Amino acid sequence: MQTVFDFTVPGSAVSYRRSTGAGFVDAAALQDAPRLHTPQMAANWQPMWWYGGWCAGFAAGPRGVAASPAPCLPAADLAGRELPVWFRADLPGEGTYQVSLRLCGRGGPVRVFAGRRRLMWQGTLTEGQVRELRFPLDVTPLVPDGETQPALNAAADLAVTGADLQAVCLQPAAMPRVFLMGDSTVTDQCAGLPYAPGSSYAGWGQMLGRFLPGDWCVSNHAHSGLTTESFTEGGHWAIVEPRLRAGDFCLLQFGHNDQKLPHLAARGGYTERLRGYLRAIRTRGAQPVLVTPLARNTWTADGRYNDLLAEYAAAVFDLGR
């Protein structure tokens, strides 16, 4: 069943409320639904602390809805930065969904994010140019950072910078998924507002969907600080494992934090735990993919690159063989 929102209709752009289940997120919406402030439980936007509150609103016009700065945000602070318009619509529950958007350009770069600030499209639209997009959305429980129990954000969180949002269509759609297991270099990171694309934290898993075919859905369960061990101990594997299906892929990248624990040595506990995940993933009929850990930017005194994770990368290669 499709759910359609047309924001070119006068009066259709309203602030989100839990009672109505759809609308644009502004300061009033966050007062009504404070859980939207929680990282990883909504769109992963966090205003800079010195603004003293939410700094983005929305403005409706004949071409759709665009972001507007809140009174606390000086115009000078937007120089070289972007302000997203954030639309949220509650969904019936867990699953995979197809999202369709219609945008109207403002003569510059455009970025479209879904879920926890996952990049789904970026490009340039000329003034008044209309562009329709389609992409998948994963709605799966996760254990938020700092919490111990799984939580489900059963909603479509969609954010657009540089364009007017004219229409949204949401519908359930079965599709294969790419599950991600890993650490801070993979996870869905928060970004400050106003948004500075070149200097905001982001895991590569946050951008992966932009480069996959449109019928593949990314389900990211990586979190900062995780190891091959704590991914299980923290309850994340208990979410991923039963949801794996034949035809799914599961990408695993650990090492940054395993390296800090003697019992998770590259040729010891690290390899053994990866091997256990590979067996379990294959048992579910899914295809595991080992990813070597991203190396830190460290250098020797004479200016040569110092790869502190080379041993872990070599262990991954050997296990893959």
Model feature map: region roles:
Residues 159-161, 222, 253:
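Short beta-strand segments
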Residues 184, 227, 257:
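Gly/Ser/Thr-rich beta-alpha loop segments that engage phosphate groups in nucleotides
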Residues 222-225, 294:
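Short, solvent-exposed turn/loop segments enriched in Gly/Ser/Thr/Pro and often Arg
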